[in-house]
Regions:
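Intrinsically disordered, low-complexity, charged terminal extensions of DNA damage-control enzymes
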Residues: 1-36, 41
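Catalytic cores of DNA base-excision repair glycosylases
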Residues: 24-174
Length: 174
């Protein structure tokens, strides 16, 4: 079997597994009406960014309710920038690792400078390169890759703990 064939086989099997077992209910990966986006369709970079930072060292089932409350209080980047740090930390209460909330708040201010307050809903104004995202506090390569691939449907690598675990199982490494 050629190497390219084995890659195609791995991709096929992973996509089939996800179709049967994946989390299809995650609100930041759905359209506003709750439907699944088409391939190539952009989702909210803001909503995905907040979710990805919340998901750092926290399970999805815990993040879901916090993310929904966050989006009610800070529905846009501008709402987040206009909030004071105390308010941001109050909404983070219970998630732990409060430095993540502080970094989100700092990053929001930097993103507004980069994007401009008039362009927050224009996905073409948001960063789409890993090197741009990792300049923001609290964003590493895996988080940046996940934001870019989810929000902009671009093929960028994500090598987080889950991906490493899958590869380890595939090649029998402990």
């Amino acid at each position: 079997m050629e190497f390219a064939d084995s890659i195609d086989n791995i991709q096929f099997n992973l996509l089939n597994w996800f179709a049967s077992n994946g989390r299809h209910f995650i609100p930041w990966k759905l359209r506003n009406d709750g439907s699944i986006p088409d391939q190539g369709e952009f989702l909210s970079p803001y909503e995905i960014w907040i979710a990805e930072v919340m998901l750092q060292q926290t399970q999805v089932k815990v993040v879901l309710s916090y993310w929904e409350k966050w989006m009610l209080s800070f529905p846009t980047l501008i709402h987040l920038v206009e909030a004071d740090e105390h308010e941001v930390l109050m909404h983070w209460q219970g998630l732990g690792y409060y430095s993540r909330a502080k970094r989100i708040h700092q990053s929001a201010k930097l993103l507004i400078e980069h994007i401009g307050s008039d362009n927050i809903f224009d996905t073409s104004c948001w960063p789409i390169e890993i090197d741009q995202w990792i300049q923001l506090p609290g964003i590493g390569k895996s988080t940046a890759g996940s934001i870019i691939s989810s929000a902009f449907d671009l093929p960028v690598p994500i090598l987080d703990g889950n991906v490493k675990r899958i590869f380890s199982r595939m090649v029998s490494i402990e």
